[in-house]
């Protein structure tokens, strides 16, 4: 399914129809979702349309297929480079747990890398959590703005959603965008471990990872 979209050309989308479907709690198809995210990435929606879209998904809840389509589009627009390792793992969290814990995913990634595993850690600064991966690395004295072969700092790789930040901040609630970071690693990890802020999203993200073609994955949520 994903490979079919490599040379896919977007059509003009009926945004009002999509908003009506979401208002009636109907899921969008993979194609509709892919087209919609491309419209968002190309800044083709008005702030009112974007705000309505985010709010509609907040009430409906995204499907695994919708998330996989969104992530596929973002990966297609991200900066890339060739990688030789046939197996690689990403360990990442969604953030947003409000527990103010240390950055578990990054410390785990460093531990696994020291054991010889090929880790492709994709991360950002903390937005809804106290310490994102980039915050931790910066405090360790690591330059996060190195070339992407050395550091997969999300803002240096994904430029498609910079204009969305203002609307997200004005709305002030978690949205499907909080779930896209862990799914949008441009190196397409073969194995993945994702921590989520709510147990309600474990199966949802697992389904999205399956659609995206990840070979083995675990989506976890702590009970503490």
Feature locations, PLM:
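Gly/Ser/Thr-rich beta-alpha loop segments that engage phosphate groups in nucleotides
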Residues: 95-98, 125, 134, 183, ...
């Amino acid at each position: 399914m994903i490979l079919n979209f490599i040379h896919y050309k977007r059509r003009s989308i009926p945004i009002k129809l999509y908003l009506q479907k979401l208002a009636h709690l109907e899921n969008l198809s993979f194609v509709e979702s892919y087209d919609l995210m491309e419209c968002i990435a190309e800044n083709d929606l008005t702030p009112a349309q974007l705000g309505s879209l985010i709010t509609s998904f907040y009430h409906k809840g995204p499907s695994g297929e919708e998330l996989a389509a969104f992530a596929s589009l973002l990966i297609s627009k991200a900066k890339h480079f060739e990688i030789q390792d046939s197996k690689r793992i990403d360990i990442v969290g969604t953030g947003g747990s409000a527990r103010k814990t240390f950055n578990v995913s990054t410390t785990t990634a460093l531990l696994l890398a020291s054991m010889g595993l090929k880790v492709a850690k994709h991360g950002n600064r903390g937005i809804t959590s106290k310490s994102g991966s980039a915050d931790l690395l910066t405090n360790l004295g690591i330059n996060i703005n190195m070339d992407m072969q050395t550091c997969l700092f999300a803002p240096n790789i994904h430029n498609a959603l910079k204009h969305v930040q203002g609307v997200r901040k004005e709305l002030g609630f978690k949205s499907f965008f909080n779930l896209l970071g862990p799914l949008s690693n441009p190196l397409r990890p073969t194995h993945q471990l994702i921590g989520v802020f709510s147990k309600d999203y474990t199966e949802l993200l697992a389904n999205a990872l399956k659609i995206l073609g990840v070979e083995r994955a675990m989506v976890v949520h702590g009970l503490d």
